């Protein structure tokens, strides 16, 4: 009977330990998923910022090009 009790306690102990390990892995997995989601959100925000900067640079390039074209035209065809 004592052997049966020890075996039962051993089985229960091992079951609790394995359950504890599974719960810990599950928590780690959830934390990793949260971090990945946060990284994706940051990536989306960074992409928006990059697009905004590229649009600003594009518009600045257009303005500089128009000014340069006007300067060249005035240089080639000066008004008197």
Swiss-Prot record:
Keyword hit for Secreted: yes
Pfam families in the record: FSAP_sig_propep
Location in or out of the cell: Secreted
Biological process, per Gene Ontology: defense response to bacterium
Tissues where this protein is expressed: Expressed by the skin glands.
Signal peptide range: 1-22
Primary location group: secreted
Role of this protein: Has antibacterial activity.
Similarity comment text for this entry: Belongs to the frog skin active peptide (FSAP) family. Dermaseptin subfamily.
Protein name: Raniseptin-5
Organism: Boana raniceps
Origin organism lineage: Eukaryota, Metazoa, Chordata, Craniata, Vertebrata
């Amino acid at each position: 009977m004592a052997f049966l009790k020890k075996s039962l306690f051993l089985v229960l102990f091992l079951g609790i330990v394995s359950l504890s390990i599974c719960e810990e892995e599950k928590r780690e997995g959830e934390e990793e998923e949260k971090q990945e989601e946060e990284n994706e959100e940051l990536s989306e925000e960074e992409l928006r910022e990059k697009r905004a900067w590229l649009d600003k640079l594009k518009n600045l390039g257009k303005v500089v090009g128009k000014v340069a074209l006007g300067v060249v035209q005035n240089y080639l065809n000066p008004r008197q």
